[in-house]
Curated annotation (Swiss-Prot):
This is E3 ubiquitin-protein ligase RNFT1. SUPFAM superfamilies: RING/U-box (SSF57850). It is an enzyme of class 2 (transferase). Residues 368-419 are annotated as: Required for ubiquitin ligase activity and for protection against ER stress-induced cell death. Residues 16-34 have a biased composition (Basic and acidic residues). The keyword Endoplasmic reticulum applies. Keywords: Endoplasmic reticulum, Membrane, Metal-binding, Transferase, Transmembrane, Transmembrane helix, Ubl conjugation pathway, Zinc, Zinc-finger. Expressed at highest levels in testis, lower levels in heart, liver, lung, and kidney. Not detected in brain, ovary, and uterus. Down-regulated in testis from patients with maturation arrest (MA) or Sertoli cell-only syndrome (SCOS). Ubiquitously expressed with high expression in testis. Its main location: endoplasmic reticulum.
Amino acid sequence: MPLFLLSLPTPPSASGHERRQRPEAKTSGSEKKYLRAMQANRSQLHSPPGTGSSEDASTPQCVHTRLTGEGSCPHSGDVHIQINSIPKECAENASSRNIRSGVHSCAHGCVHSRLRGHSHSEARLTDDTAAESGDHGSSSFSEFRYLFKWLQKSLPYILILSVKLVMQHITGISLGIGLLTTFMYANKSIVNQVFLRERSSKIQCAWLLVFLAGSSVLLYYTFHSQSLYYSLIFLNPTLDHLSFWEVFWIVGITDFILKFFFMGLKCLILLVPSFIMPFKSKGYWYMLLEELCQYYRTFVPIPVWFRYLISYGEFGNVTRWSLGILLALLYLILKLLEFFGHLRTFRQVLRIFFTQPSYGVAASKRQCSDVDDICSICQAEFQKPILLICQHIFCEECMTLWFNREKTCPLCRTVISDHINKWKDGATSSHLQIY
């Protein structure tokens, strides 16, 4: 119970001679004030009423109060009064605080224990996962090591089989390498001659034409017994039985021969003088020929593959024959879908070929003088200057070459054309159409 200490001034002592001689009225007045102050302090200590009976002596409180009298006291002391009383509400508050603190400490301890348990479980799960991943990685590494050892032991046998396969198909492999080399050489030469424009060599173009024609004739003459040229007009070569490698052989040779044929047509266009056919018109012809070549090459392999798929069921029962028919029909459906997918592009190419859209209007001399009569692309004087919609001026030939691969202005990147004339530079697609 809390201990209250009241520090009160002591009454004047009557021990001195001088104090006895003070007036009685003055002494009695100071004592009355002293008594009134004590009563006021006691009334404050015991308020509110009705709570003094429930005091608890186990929790002392101390209050130190000092009251100073109104009268002049030359010698005054402090009186300490201990009051062992506390209201019931204070005791209840203290007990409730103790209970709450105990509950809080208990809950806090439970939460901490749960968190520690959860952290320990997570740590164990992490360790287990790491161990499993380590085991999986080690097992994968061991399997890869076993596979490598098996390949290392089997390498001599693989080399023997590879040499045997090469010897069996040495003719086809050698011919394929020769055709690919011929195509790459001719394609690069044609692109260079188209780029040179008026400086192109007519002799070089004539040589390319003769070289491509001679290669095609020599190839068909060498294998005339197989009648490989039949596949150029959607007929089957004269072969008794078509295997997979024979189909691959026929389709591959036919695809290269078609490329050589259209490349020869491009060489003929190169030989045409520029006053008969301008360079701008030649570019559109190159583009049209390449698109025709690609679409024709798409349909040429159809008869050969269709015969191969149908022949799958000729020497078997009804189930195998039905399966062959189903595979052939699926092949035809896929080819038709491919054709209709490219039909939009082909229509766009035809529209460009017949309209030959212009990229701008002819620039005036004043407009050319404003830019010092120098083309920003070729760094030379303007030749047939063209004013674009972005107000930049370039040579017509420079613009034609630029828009063969780009859609925007070389300086400000404003979109000028809605399409790219991919094949106007005379190039031929290197894609091998084998299906």
